[in-house]
Structures are given as structure tokens and as C-alpha cells.
Amino acid sequence: AMTVAPFLRHGPEGAALPLVLDSPHSGEHYPDDFDHVPPRAMVRRAEDTHVARLYRGATRVGATLIEATFPRAYIDANRSLVDLDPSMLADDWPDAVTPSRKTEQGIGLVWRIARGGTPLYNRKLSAAEVQRRIDRWYLPYHAALATEIDTLHRAFGAVWHINCHSM
């Protein structure tokens, strides 16, 4: 199977500006282990579809765009790592969790429900599989974003970061 990178980096065309855009919710690659129960079309309603495409034009004026490739319902790059619902897990999570209102609504770090309230899973997730999602998708995305911001900050002394969404 083809290995999909956790993010796409769209670099500036021409001279760089200290401007980083990221699109954490436009990912359309559904990993093989995302065994959601509702139909794909329903799960896809969580996506900020086409947001990354809308902002790609910013690279023409010197911005850098980091785009998530994975779906937010699988692992949400715009949530804190502690924003986890322990009731979704079959076993204990090794770290402290601080579920937010988003998690209470079923849309935390790992989504419990699809848009409209349909449960995503007919099983509990293992702590190990959630950790794999974090390691394989979430952390590399955030590392790429941090690298971009740090590099431009060093070069320019300041940097602007715009987190891009469809609402």
C-alpha cells in the first residue's frame, strides 16, 4: 500500500514572507484502520473540505501552507493531546486527560460521533491504537508546523500563523 504523508507542505513561490497557514481539517485520506460504522459520506461531513485548496493561492505571495492529509474525525490536529474521552477506550490511557467541552460533545482529539450524532464506532478503541494515530499523524503534522514557524521566526524576527477553517 502507498504510504501517505501526514501533511503536505506548500512552500512559497518566490520570496518567503513570515506567514504560515495551516489547514488541520481538510484531510481526505482515510487510513485503513479507521473502521467507522456510519457511511463514509456521513463521516466526511466533518471535513473542512477544500479549505487547503482555497488557501493554496497564498503561496504565490510568499506564504507557506501546511495541510493535514488525515481526517479530523480520526485524529483531530486542532485539539490538545489531553482532550481525550477515556470512556472511548478499552483500557487505561497512560497520561492525564483534560476533556474539554468539545470532547463532551463527542468531537475531541478522537471523535466519538459523526456530524448529526451517529456513533463512529461499535467498539472501544485501545490506548495503543489512539497512541499510534497520535504518533503517525498528529505529532508529525505539529512538528512540521512548528518547524515552519520557528524557521521563519528566526529569519524574520516575527511570524504570523493563520489556522484555516471553513466556518
Predicted regions and their residues:
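A glycine-rich, aromatic-flanked flexible loop/lid motif
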Residues: 163-167
